Amino acid sequence: MTAEEIKELDAQVRKARFVLSQKAGALHDLIEDRLPADYLEIPAYAEDTFLACKAWDELNKKLTENKI
């Protein structure tokens, strides 16, 4: 990868990390503020958080492999 491509990938990793943090925060807020009343919403929030983590992990691995 070129230096420019690595820079772009790094930006994508940072953006994915931000999205991951937002999803995790929403799950945390659900647990802290709305349980047990809204317990049926847990699977959707958990799935969103899982997918955000997976997206970040894939991008981060690609970045790590190409930075070397």
Question: Which residues are covered by each model-predicted region?
Answer:
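Short, charge-rich amphipathic interface segments used for partner binding and complex assembly
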Residues: 25, 29-68
